[in-house]
Amino acid sequence: MSHKKSGTYWATLITAFLKTVSKVEELDCVDSAVLVDVSKIITLTQEFRRHYDSVYRADYGPALKNWKRDLSKLFTSLFVDVINSGRIVGFFDVGRYVCEEVLCPGSWTEDHELLNDCMTHFFIENNLMNHFPLEDIFLAQRKFQTTGFTFLLHALAKVLPRIYSGNVIYV
C-alpha cells in the first residue's frame, strides 16, 4: 500500500492543510512531500472557488454558522451518493472556509483542533484516501465541469438549510 493511502499520511496532510490555510507558522516539522501535497490541495480549492463562486458565497456562510454541531452532517450529505475527486476537493474547501472565515486566522485554537479531528475522522472512517489519488490531482482540477459537481452544488444549495435545521436530507 502506498504511504499516500495510509490513514496516518492523510491525518498529517489534513492537519498541515488546516494549519496552512489558518496561517499558523508551526509547520517546521512537516515533511516536504506533505507540504507539496498541501500546496496542490490549496490550488484545487482555489480553482474550485473560481468555478463555483456563487455557491461558495451564498451557501457556506449560513450553512457553516453552526459548524461544530453540523459539520459531519454536511460531509455525509456531500458523499452520500457518490465519491469523486470534485467532492473531495469540496470537503477540503469546507475546512478551508471554516479556517479562513469562521475561526481566527493566525492561531491554532481548540476549535481548530475540533475541526481537524472532525475532518480527519470523517476522511479516514469513510476510506476517502482510496478515492483521491494525489498523483491525479491536477487532472481532477481540469475535470470539475464533467464530474457532475455543478449538479451537486445546486442540490446542496437547496438542502443545506434543511440539513442545518435538523432534517437529514439525502441528495
From Swiss-Prot:
Q: List keywords of the entry alphabetically.
A: Disulfide bond, Host cytoplasm, Host-virus interaction, Inhibition of host apoptosis by viral BCL2-like protein, Inhibition of host autophagy by virus, Modulation of host cell apoptosis by virus
Q: Where in the cell is it found?
A: Host cytoplasm
Gene3D superfamilies found in the cross-reference section: Blc2-like
> Which top-level group of life is the source organism from?
Viruses
According to its UniProt entry, the protein's GO biological process terms are: regulation of apoptotic process; symbiont-mediated suppression of host apoptosis; symbiont-mediated suppression of host autophagy
InterPro entries to which the protein is assigned, alphabetical? Apo_reg_M11, Bcl-2-like_sf
What stretches pass through the bilayer? Answer: none
A Pfam family of this chain: Bcl-2_3
Give the protein's biological function.
Plays a role in the protection against apoptosis mediated by cytotoxic cells during the immune response to acute and persistent viral infection. Contributes therefore to latency establishment. Plays also a role in the inhibition of host starvation-induced autophagy which ultimately contributes to the viral chronic infection.
Q: What is this protein called?
A: Apoptosis regulator Bcl-2 homolog
